[in-house]
Amino acid sequence: MIKVGTKDITDIRLGNTAVKAVYLGSDKVWEKNKPVYQLYMNGGSGSVKINGNTVNLTQKGSDYYLSGFTDTVTSFKDMFDGNGADRISVFDFNTSSSGVVLDGMFANCAVSIVNINPFKGLKVLTANHFVYGNSEIENLDLDMSECTSINDFVTDNDTPRIWFRNNWDMGKVRTINRLLNYTNSQAVISPTTIDISNWNLSSLRQFTMGDLYCTNLNQDWLTLKLGTGFFSSDYCNRWDFSGVRAHVWKNIGDLATMLPTITTAKTIVLNADTQTTLTSEQYNAITAKGWTISNS
């Protein structure tokens, strides 16, 4: 249990953002609402003890710094959940070289801007529900070189353009289920570019992009930049983009230029209405590279 003096902490907050739980190794050393003391970081600086280690919570201007872990941290689950105009600028964790599990790390942080570049010492092993709800995060950079699984990485967010970095080492990723799930009923969506053209998914076994659409069907808001390395795996024969609707995918006509020429049977799955937006020349350019186009 985390204590300040003899007081047990039931709630850790960075600004208005609540920390739900803290893990060291495989042990959950603190959980929200157990038992009856609250520590708020609405200003100034402070520290807490975790297994004998002092963890510093420091505010500098509008920025928050969380640092001081000396034990190995291997798992984060639902760590930040709440509403607030906070900037959490530097996380300095001591983590195992084998990587960490990120499971629901940022949830419903409406109007929060979380700047976690650098995310010092953090190697991601799996990333599940990493960001969901109305969270806003910028400058996200993670060491993905040990990551093998991504599931629902970003779900129901208003600003998906800021989540992915083109320099991530994705060479060990075997499974991607719903890289980005985004539905929206807004009348206006800002143009979004997701540039992951340098990703090399050479170990991939399974891929689904996720559902991307909005109720305003006249919004061509997503430019999706992929490279031939994205489709380079010899172990995956089906890339599923069926959830990406035609009214979203602004540059679907460029798909043929993103695909490599192949000699073994592989399928790219497109939504039926997305297929109808392809000209015959664009369709033929895809199949000429050896790809089969399917809608199921």
PLM regions with names:
Residues 2, 12, 22, 76, ...:
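Periodically patterned hydrophobic/aromatic "hotspot" residues that form packing/interaction faces
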Residues 73-84, 284-291:
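Extended Gly/Ser/Thr-rich low-complexity repeat segments
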Residues 233, 261-264:
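A structural signal for short secondary-structure junctions
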